[in-house]
A protein has these predicted regions:
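Proline-centered turn/helix-capping motifs that create local helix->coil transitions or kinks
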Residues: 158-159, 204-216, 270, 310-315, ...
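Cytochrome P450 catalytic-core helices
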Residues: 253-278, 389-404
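Cytochrome P450 proximal C-terminal region
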Residues: 6, 33-34, 123, 166-171, ...
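N-terminal membrane-proximal hinge/A-helix region immediately C-terminal to the signal-anchor transmembrane segment
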Residues: 1-94, 98, 113, 117-125, ...
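Cytochrome P450 I-helix active-site segment
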Residues: 6-16, 116-120, 168-172, 187, ...
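Cytochrome P450 heme-thiolate monooxygenase catalytic core
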Residues: 1-9, 72-83, 91, 95, ...
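Conserved cytochrome P450 K-helix/beta-meander segment immediately N-terminal to the heme-binding cysteine loop
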Residues: 339-366
Length: 444
């Protein structure tokens, strides 16, 4: 083990480092990797310990998988707990394991297959309400679609009545995650948005609890789950925390990924032509099904490449619970290790011309030639996103269903900028013009 510290900016004024990170966090972390290499040491504001930024796939594996028991989560816990309570995203240790075991069956392949029909039906419903020549913010459209899918599949509930309220409240809440210290006015806005979100979620919980109905979905499981020690049921607050976590993770990440897919396809018409040809040949005008996914390989590669370029879960932090070693350097107990899928997935060593959109990076041969942890848009290890397979199928089916009738073009002059919050959003949305496809087969 190297007894020395890794290179970095630890001697720079901590306030200057904090300012640089807040101003443009993606450029900040990309700059650390570019200027100092695979492991960087820095200080941040008045944080009492060193922080380390690691970007090499081997170190990513060590932090997320091989040495994950030596770390706890690190983030603005207080703010996230205000929104998600003690749900799966925030909890640690045995509580986290129990919550994960409780939810896991609803993300097994067999269960996910049963959601395919609802995913396709909702995508078709969206495409039928679109109008030729209309301008839409594709981020809002994909947000609605992903929200309806999570509500229908995991919660057995039509959330359309609350969709706009939930979307706007979540946007306000996520905006506040960009700041670590909120002025009072912002905190008041945050509290109001959280209140609106709670009202919608509690309404869904109370309506289902009143019926006592077991629909075999995730919400029923949460309401009927019994404590291993005393046999008691979850309180509305406990159900709310779990439901809020899964609802946020289940729709926010998918909505962002789908939005970036449409943007990338519009920028690369040569890929779009091949994409439309694949969809037309595989589906011949009918609704996409689960068993169509093997016949839509390019569609899957497009989704994977969008997740590489714009990973929704773009950064994670871990706090060392003991003295350990990562990348050949000592990490003291209490230190924080930060990993960014965005940075690693834009590393030219693993992805030549990393800014270029190239779905062919996802052929079996290309994947086998790269380190496993050069790509981790859903994190990895014991805290990997449970919904990875759910999101993958949702992405393929929704892209295919919408592309059967439409092609989309970015409105000229519309600004495209990243907004790195808890997830990676488009700061100004993505305004796109809908164009009905004249070359598609008749759609059933």
């Amino acid at each position: 083990m190297n007894s020395k510290h890794p290179p970095g900016t630890a001697d720079a004024p901590p306030g200057a480092t904090l300012y640089a990170m807040r101003r443009d966090p993606i450029s900040f972390f990309m700059g650390l990797a570019r200027d100092y290499g695979d492991m960087v040491r820095f200080r941040l504001g008045d944080h009492p310990h060193d922080l380390f930024f690691v970007s090499h796939p081997d170190s990513v594996r060590d932090v997320l998988v091989t040495q994950d028991r030596s770390f706890s989560k690190w983030f603005s816990v207080e703010r996230i707990r205000e929104v998600l309570g003690d749900g799966l995203f925030v909890s640690e240790g045995e509580i986290h394991l129990r919550q994960r075991r409780l939810a896991q069956p609803f993300f097994h392949r067999e269960r996910i297959a049963s959601y395919a029909e609802q995913m396709s039906a909702l995508a078709i419903r969206l495409r039928e309400r679109w109008q030729d020549g209309a301008v839409v913010d594709i981020c809002r459209e994909m947000n609605w679609l992903a929200m309806m899918i999570v509500g229908s599949t995991l919660f057995g509930t039509n959330v359309e009545i609350d969709a706009a309220e939930i979307r706007d409240a979540l946007s306000e809440i996520l905006d506040q995650f960009e700041r670590s210290i909120l002025p009072q006015a912002d905190r008041e806005d945050f509290a109001k948005a959280l209140g609106r979100l709670d009202t919608a979620v509690y309404r869904i919980i109370q309506e289902r609890r009143a019926t006592g109905e077991d629909r075999g979905d995730l919400l029923s499981m949460l309401l009927l789950a019994q404590d291993e020690d005393d046999g008691g049921r979850m309180s509305d607050l406990q159900v709310r925390d779990e439901a809020m976590t899964i609802f946020l993770a289940g729709h926010e990440t998918s909505a962002n990924a789908l939005s970036w897919c449409w943007y990338l396809l519009a920028q690369h018409p040569e890929v779009e032509v091949r994409f439309h040809a694949e969809v037309d040949e595989a589906l011949k005008g009918r609704a996409p099904r689960m068993d169509d996914t093997p016949r839509l390989p390019l569609t899957g590669r497009i989704f994977a490449e969008a997740l590489r370029l714009y990973p929704p879960l773009w950064v994670v932090g871990r706090r060392a619970l003991e003295d350990i070693e990562i990348g050949g350097y000592p990490i003291a107990k209490g230190s924080v290790v930060i990993i960014s899928s965005y940075v690693t997935q834009h590393d030219a060593r693993w992805f030549p011309e990393p800014e270029r959109f190239d779905p062919e990076r996802w052929t079996a041969e290309a994947r086998a030639a790269r380190p496993k942890f050069s790509y981790f848009p859903f994190s990895a290890g014991s805290r990997a996103c449970l919904g990875e397979a759910f999101a993958g199928m949702e992405g393929v089916l929704c892209l295919a269903a919408l592309a059967q009738k439409w092609r989309l073009r970015v409105v000229p002059g519309h600004p495209i900028a990243l907004q790195p919050q808890l997830t990676l959003r488009a700061r100004h949305g993505i305004k796109m013009t809908l164009a009905a496809r004249a070359d598609s087969p008749p759609v059933a």
